[in-house]
């Protein structure tokens, strides 16, 4: 584990769980036993199976590897990134509630009380929506649900600075 700017412990390498489908649990266990200490997933059934990551976390106890030894990262995926038939939150709910519902689904799927990192899977337009999303994520962080926040698939340095300053 390595320190970062918020004094959280990050894994040196994360194992990505996208596109593993029914093999997710076995592959996560194999990766962690091989030395990975970070797991990256998302509440996005289109590409991830978070419930099988949760199964893997449970199975790892049989090898003496506890949750607290791992860096667990999940993501909120906005509607545009979801399969319309498998959205893990209420599509018609306000954005803030979608994020809260997605995060609660992640905790249930992962059988975890908290995650080390909650990531916004991609920027959201318009900017006002993006800032609302970030505010909802900050609430999760402030209540201890996520130890740190981030954004992926963002190529706008100005936006990253704005989120950091928020």
What are these regions (language model features)?
Residues 1-74, 113, 132, 142:
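N-terminal binding-site loop/beta-alpha segment at the start of enzyme catalytic domains
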Residues 18-20, 44, 75-79, 120-123, ...:
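Active-site beta-loop-alpha junctions enriched in small/polar residues
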Residues 66, 77, 93-94:
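Alpha-helix initiation/capping motif
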Residues 70-85:
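Eukaryotic helix-linker segments that join adjacent hydrophobic helices
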Residues 83-166:
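Glycine/proline-rich, positively charged
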């Amino acid at each position: 584990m390595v320190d970062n700017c918020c004094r959280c412990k990050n894994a040196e390498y994360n194992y990505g769980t996208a596109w593993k489908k029914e093999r997710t649990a076995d592959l996560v266990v194999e990766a962690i036993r091989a030395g990975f200490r970070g797991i990256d997933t998302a509440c996005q059934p289109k590409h991830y199976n978070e419930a099988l990551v949760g199964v893997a976390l449970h199975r790892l106890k049989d090898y003496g590897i506890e949750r607290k030894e791992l860096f667990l990262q999940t993501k909120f995926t906005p509607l545009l990134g979801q399969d319309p038939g498998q959205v893990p939150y209420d599509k018609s709910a306000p954005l803030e509630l979608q994020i809260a519902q997605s995060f609660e689904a992640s905790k249930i799927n992962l059988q975890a009380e908290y995650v080390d990192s909650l990531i916004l899977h991609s920027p959201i337009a318009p900017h006002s929506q993006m800032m609302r999303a970030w505010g909802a994520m900050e609430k999760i962080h402030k209540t201890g649900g996520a130890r740190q926040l981030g954004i992926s698939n963002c190529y706008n340095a100005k936006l990253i600075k704005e989120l950091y300053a928020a």
